[in-house]
Swiss-Prot record:
Protein name per the record: Actin, cytoplasmic
Record field: catalytic activity: ATP + H2O = ADP + phosphate + H(+)
Source organism of the structure: Euplotes crassus
Enzyme class: hydrolase
InterPro entries the record matches: Actin, Actin/actin-like_CS, Actin_CS, ATPase_NBD
One example GO MF annotation: ATP binding
Function per UniProt: Actins are highly conserved proteins that are involved in various types of cell motility and are ubiquitously expressed in all eukaryotic cells.
PROSITE patterns membership: ACTINS_1, ACTINS_ACT_LIKE
Similarity annotation: Belongs to the actin family.
Main location per the UniProt record: cytoplasm
Pfam families per the UniProt record, alphabetical: Actin
Keyword Hydrolase: yes
Keyword Thylakoid attached: no
A GO term from the CC aspect: cytoskeleton
Length: 379
């Protein structure tokens, strides 16, 4: 789409702890997906980049400079913690990836559940003062995942790179007191995979090596329906072994690690974590809600985020929830094949609705009421 054709088209940006998804409203997929990472030179000397001297690199740029740079993640556990770094990521998103003139487009940003008020106000102020967007909106990621699944009531299990949230939603509004979260997600699974591969004398310690392990995790891992039975099957010589070609050409044989890694979500104690499992988290969230909405929540468990993409995860969660739920309760887990982009797609759909046109926070609203307007309009 040319800039002319795209004039006034809303921009949708889903800022995740590990990955940014960005694109134009009305599209089915984000046109730009890159790591939420800022790479800064380890020494004070500025690195010469393709576009002249640069004091930092963002997204895919940082891959080429990995050895001489320190990596930082501006978003920690779903929350923006480093605003300078975040602005570098937004610069890269708008000008390098989407190549837009920001004053010509509304922008919809996503946020984690229970995002602090100050964070929302900062996002609002930066979009208007630094980028001159004509209008903006902020929506909770889990609500957008629910819209993406064609529902307004349900419970979203959203697991990305840095955090796993379970968010119950009734008629489009989150139920804040029942939101659950654990700091156990994709990055932790990658680290755990490094540990269990180390037991077999494979050592993955550098950033580049961890990227390899992440790729192994995403391509070969799956969730066992019954963990103990799967271990027994492996011990009896079951056909579980797969081979992965390492960057240096050596083959890596992997068998039980394929299901041991994602089992961490269902048995956190395996990796030495004292936190709730993903199914206990979901059950506790539902049981904290009013009795009259629980039935709708059990019947609409929506998976969202890249860490829910393991084959077998939806089936295992269904089995665990069926065991925990009252016997007569109908349990349904909805696992869309492209759920890693569910949040972005929900934003793309919302921003395109004609009924949404009056919901935007405009530059005029901001001039009159200041950044606190975001709490009145983005609810």
């Amino acid at each position: 789409m040319s800039e002319e054709e795209n004039a006034k088209e809303a921009i949708v940006v889903d800022n995740g702890s590990g990955v940014v998804k960005a694109g134009f409203a009305g599209e089915n997929q984000p046109c730009s997906v890159f790591p939420s990472v800022v790479a800064k030179p380890k020494t004070k000397q500025v690195i010469v980049g393709g576009a002249g001297n640069k004091d930092c690199f963002v997204g895919d740029e940082r891959q080429q400079k990995r050895g001489v740079c320190t990596l930082s993640y501006p978003i920690k556990s779903g929350m923006i913690k480093d605003w300078d770094g975040m602005q570098k990521i937004w610069d890269y998103t708008f000008y390098n990836e989407l190549r837009i003139e920001t004053e010509n487009h509304p922008v919809l940003l996503t946020e984690a559940p229970l995002n602090p008020k100050q964070n929302r106000e900062n996002m609002c102020r930066i979009m208007f003062e630094e980028y001159d967007f004509p209008s903006m909106y902020i929506q909770i990621q889990a609500v957008l995942s629910l819209y993406s699944a064609g529902r307004t009531t349900g419970i979203v299990v959203d697991s990305g790179d840095g955090v796993t949230h379970v968010v119950p939603i009734f008629e489009g509004y989150q139920i804040p007191h029942a939101i659950e979260k654990i700091l156990l997600a994709g990055r932790d699974l990658t680290d755990y995979m490094c540990r269990i591969l180390k037991d077999d004398d494979y050592h993955f310690e550098t950033t580049a090596e961890k990227e390899t392990v992440r790729d192994i995790k995403e391509k070969l891992c799956y969730v066992a329906d019954d963990y103990e039975a799967e271990l027994k099957k492996a011990g009896e010589g079951g056909e579980l072994e797969e081979s992965y070609a390492l960057p240096d050409g050596r083959p890596l044989k992997i068998s039980t690690q394929r299901f041991q890694c994602p089992e961490f979500l269902f048995q956190p104690d395996l990796g030495g974590r004292e936190c709730k499992s993903v199914h206990q988290l979901t059950y506790d969230s539902i049981m904290t809600c009013d009795l009259d909405v629980r039935k709708d929540l059990y019947a609409n468990i929506i998976l969202s985020g890249g860490t829910t993409m393991f084959p077998g995860l939806g089936e295992r969660l269904y089995k665990e929830m069926k065991d925990l739920a009252p016997q007569t309760m109908k349990v349904k887990v909805i696992a869309s094949p492209d759920r890693k982009y569910a949040v972005w797609r929900g934003g793309s759909t919302l921003a395109k609705l004609s009924t949404f046109a009056g919901m935007w926070v405009t530059k005029e609203d901001y001039a009159e009421f200041g950044e606190s307007i975001v709490h009145r309009k983005c609810i």
